[in-house]
Every structure is written in C-alpha cells, then in structure tokens.
C-alpha cells in the first residue's frame, strides 16, 4: 500500500473510529498496524522538516497511534524483575536478540523503556529513560537518566537530553503539533519542553527551564518576546517577569519566563559538547 493510500485509509478510519474495537479485523487493523510499523522503523515520522524551513506535521500518523489504542486490549507483559506490566502497547525491543540490537546500532542501558512505534536511530544512547509511542530520536543523541520523550516528539541528531528532562507529548492533552528538538541541541537537567514548542538547532537550554506554548521567551539583548519557538543557537535560562500590582497597590507575584541570555559561543560549546567515545 502506498503512503497516500495508507493516509487516506487512516483518515477514513478516524472518521468512523467509534465503530472500532479490539474485535476489529481485516483492512482496518492492517492499515493501523502498517502505520505503526512505518513509524517504528523510521520510514515515516509524525513531523518532518520542510525545505523552506519550519516543520510539517503528519496528522494522520497521530491518528494512527490513537486508533491503535482502540484496537488493542491490555495484556500482561514481563516487567523488571518480579514486576509485570499490563498495557495495550508492546515494548519495542520485545523478543530482540543480539543480532537485532547489533543491526539497530544503538545502546540501551537496563531500565530504558521504549514503546512500539517509536524510532531509535543508530548511534543513540538510551540511559534508564522512557520513549513513548510515535517518537523519533535521531542519530548520535543521548537520552539521559530519567528523561522522558513524549508521544510523537521529534528529537534531532547529536542532542543531549539531560537527566530528568521532560519532552512533552501530543496525545494527552491533545496537541496540534509535537515538540521538536532540532539537531545539536543541549537540554539541561530537569527542564521541560512541552505543548508543541520547537527548539531550533544548536540551542542550549539551561537546567530547570520550563517552556510551554504560552511561556514568554524573552531575548535579553533586544527585548523581543517569542512564544513556542527558541531561535537557533540560543542560550536560554530560567527567569521571571514582575507581576501586575495587586488591588491594594502592593507588588503582584512574578511570572516565570525563559530568557535568551546570549547566542552559543565557543565557551558554551566546550561545556555542552557531546562525547563521541560514549557513542562508539
């Protein structure tokens, strides 16, 4: 089936999704399974860069991921040690042997969880972390300990997603577009990027920065206020804006924001460069 035909099939199924269940068989199930297989192998992705800049979202693939939940009942599955799981989505590496992992070309540390339909490119290092359905993690990237990559999130090449970082998903609450982390981005520990925010290439997000669609991103040098996009090669730290005065005239509570303090320079690169030895 061609991609165009598959997209049309998924769109039709979406319009009639109330009639789908775990008992559904035939072409409907085959179409959803094929979409998940293509996502899992990296042949398609929920969002992809456009030649003229920016990102194009393939909404039909998001629909396919959501439809798969309607088509599947939860079943028991092996967990860690004596702890079992009970879920609708199998794990990506279920049944993999040494040859299959060698073919994949990435490293998976014990405790890393990747659900089926997420794509992991060669050269990726997964510390004990979580990668959700439909996500795309490109080559040379490290997902560090306790980091989470949300549903359908797109992470570029040679990124470092530090410990405890959260990259938001699109399925709940339902978002129009996924979070996009472009190539060569460093995200500091315990930061959060959610609600379809795009972090453009080469940027450095400091520890403890929280950016959602409504977060003000302020360029300290120009005063420009941005929403939903961190410009390429920005260095971003947490900040706050003074709040409006309260009715009695006393200062109001300050509001969190993200501040672009400078553009990436050689000093910044020396502190955030990736270690090729860890990816060999």
From Swiss-Prot:
The keyword Acyltransferase applies. Pathway: Amino-acid biosynthesis; L-lysine biosynthesis via DAP pathway; LL-2,6-diaminopimelate from (S)-tetrahydrodipicolinate (succinylase route): step 1/3. One of its GO terms (molecular function) is 2,3,4,5-tetrahydropyridine-2,6-dicarboxylate N-succinyltransferase activity. Substrate binds at residues 107, 144. It is found in: Cytoplasm. Keywords: Acyltransferase, Amino-acid biosynthesis, Cytoplasm, Diaminopimelate biosynthesis, Lysine biosynthesis, Repeat, Transferase. GO terms for cellular component: cytoplasm. One of its GO terms (biological process) is diaminopimelate biosynthetic process. It catalyses: (S)-2,3,4,5-tetrahydrodipicolinate + succinyl-CoA + H2O = (S)-2-succinylamino-6-oxoheptanedioate + CoA. Its EC number is 2.3.1.117. CDD domains: LbH_THP_succinylT (cd03350). SUPFAM superfamilies: Trimeric LpxA-like enzymes. Pfam families: Hexapep_2 (PF14602), THDPS_N_2 (PF14805). It is an enzyme of class 2 (transferase). InterPro entries: DapD_Trfase_Hexpep_rpt_fam (IPR005664), Hexapep (IPR001451), THP_succinylTrfase_dom1 (IPR023180), THP_succinylTrfase_N_sf (IPR037133), Trimer_LpxA-like_sf (IPR011004). HAMAP family: DapD. Belongs to the transferase hexapeptide repeat family. Homotrimer. This is 2,3,4,5-tetrahydropyridine-2,6-dicarboxylate N-succinyltransferase.
